[in-house]
Amino acid sequence: MVCCFGKKDERTKTIEKELHKERKIMRRQINLLLLGSGESGKSTFVKQMHIIHGAGEFTADEVRAYRQQIYQNAISAMRVLLDARNKLGIAWEDPKRQVEVEKVMRFSVGDLLKGIDFTTFVEVAPIISDFWNDAAIRKTYEQRNLFQISDSCQYFFEHIPRIAMPDFYPTNRDILFCRKATRGISEHIFEINKIPFRFIDVGGQRSQRQKWFQCFTDITSILFMVASNEYDQVILEDRRTNRVVESRSVFETIVNNRAFSNVSIILFMNKNDLLQEKVPKSDIRQYFTDFTGDHTLVRDVQFFLVDKFEASRRDRARPFFYHFTTAVDTENIRRVFRDVRESILEQNLKTLMMQ
């Protein structure tokens, strides 16, 4: 019996030791919640963390899955453009293109969700290239703020010959441009300088936001992503609400929530590359009548948008941090997150000292 108790005591001590070790790790762990409207770049940011602070490369299984998703992205985006061209009444540069339309439009949403294999994709790849090179599709694409289409489609259309090769193996850059809506909650842990950083990525569509409240405990910081180039676009859910207005409304709810009174909230004004392309072509004054700067200057537009979000904060004493980012640019994210990481660790140390 004594021997039995001895073994039991040893097991208890081992369990307690493991629990103590686990609690120590949990106290050091930085929990970052990624929030923002759909298509703001949250999942792309997580991919960058994998590249910069994780394995650096994706596994063979992950790459195979991304390859199928890239095929799906290209077909899906061209279906959207073909439908929009028809609705906008834009005539084909080459009338013969019309006979090819059904070869792309035949794919149903169900087909795309099931996945597109190489054999299927290679049949339509030349047709997609021909469509993309037709002036009618280019004119339609120039009016993309009028309909819902992925920002990454141009990248894939321009790389169709490479993507359609039998030995196509997606690069990290291809994977960064690949789009798949986040459903539910996904968690990713990366050890950075011996400190575990836990990233919680939550779907940004309206239907997914009720799940945000499941993630609100033990949060160190919130990284709130905004697609800054979307000032002339409307959301998918109602096709009326301006996307930046929607993002600001969500940000206002989060930044003024009492649950986050001790949580640092960092604003990422993302898709800066696309904003720079858009500003000379799309006058922000048509969508925000209170804009008073030079509508042709990217910097004026950037700070107008930042001010919109900054003004929604009720607690003016709280520090306000923001960064202009391009989530598909690895060096930009490496540099920005280095700065963000230091400010988060500093704030976390202050919080621990107060406990």
From Swiss-Prot:
The gene is gpa-12. GO terms for biological process: adenylate cyclase-modulating G protein-coupled receptor signaling pathway; antifungal innate immune response; defense response to fungus; positive regulation of gene expression; Rho protein signal transduction. Pfam families: G-alpha. Keywords: GTP-binding, Magnesium, Metal-binding, Nucleotide-binding, Transducer. One of its GO terms (molecular function) is GTP binding. It comes from Caenorhabditis elegans. Guanine nucleotide-binding proteins (G proteins) are involved as modulators or transducers in various transmembrane signaling systems. May play a role in resistance to fungal infection in the epidermis by regulating the up-regulation of several antimicrobial peptides of the NLP and CNC families. Upstream of plc-3, tpa-1 and the p38-like pathway, required for the expression of antimicrobial peptide nlp-29 in the epidermis in response to fungal infection or physical injury. It comes from the Eukaryota. Belongs to the G-alpha family. Residues 266-273 are annotated as: G4 motif. This is Guanine nucleotide-binding protein alpha-12 subunit. Residues 28-355 form the G-alpha domain. PANTHER family: GTP-BINDING PROTEIN ALPHA SUBUNIT, GUANINE NUCLEOTIDE-BINDING PROTEIN SUBUNIT ALPHA HOMOLOG.
